[in-house]
Amino acid sequence: MKKEIRLEFDAISENEGLARVVVAAFLTQLDPTLEEVQDVKTAVSEAVTNAIVHGYEEHGGRIILEASLENGILEVVITDKGVGIEDVERAMQPMFTTRADSERSGMGFAFMEAFMDRVQVTSSPGEGTSVHMWKAFKGAVLMLSLIHISEPTRPERI
């Protein structure tokens, strides 16, 4: 049986912790290891932070967090209706940042990819971005390869 949650919240840095805790609590149904929980929390933190800093350029907006559990697979989707990403493939390169003047390292997508089994980013300039992340638990790795991912409207990296 598929289990789902959805949370919409203000795109402010204080809510990054809320998103992490909500997904971690939801994930406990799979009896994950502490390391698995930390991995997912880190990926969620990076996706939410990207939405706040880059999607809305820290001017506020709304973020939608959706998560589902089915057959031992966690899917997390973080969506913003911000400025969007002009070149997703380039943005996903380690060390690439649009905020070179700040302390941002350009490693957000690299961390998401390191801690989750699969990451897909879809974006349209002026319309926003969705970051889809999957992680398989307890023998569900084979199932993960069977997940159908619809064709994005923009370049993707999986």
What are the functions of these language-model segments?
Residues 61-67:
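A conserved short beta-strand within the histidine kinase catalytic ATPase domain
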Residues 147-158:
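Single conserved hydrophobic/aromatic residue that forms the stacking wall/gate
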Residues 127-131:
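Glycine-rich GHKL/ HATPase_c ATP-binding element in histidine kinases
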Residues 79-103:
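Glycine-rich/acidic phosphate-handling loop/turn and adjacent ATP-lid/helix
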Residues 121-125:
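A short beta-strand-to-loop motif within the catalytic HATPase_c
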Residues 20-45:
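Conserved short strand/loop->alpha-helix "switch" segment adjacent to the catalytic nucleotide/phosphoryl-transfer site
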Residues 68-76:
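Short beta-strand-loop-beta element adjacent to the nucleotide/active-site pocket used for signaling
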Residues 101-116:
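Glycine-rich phosphate-binding loop
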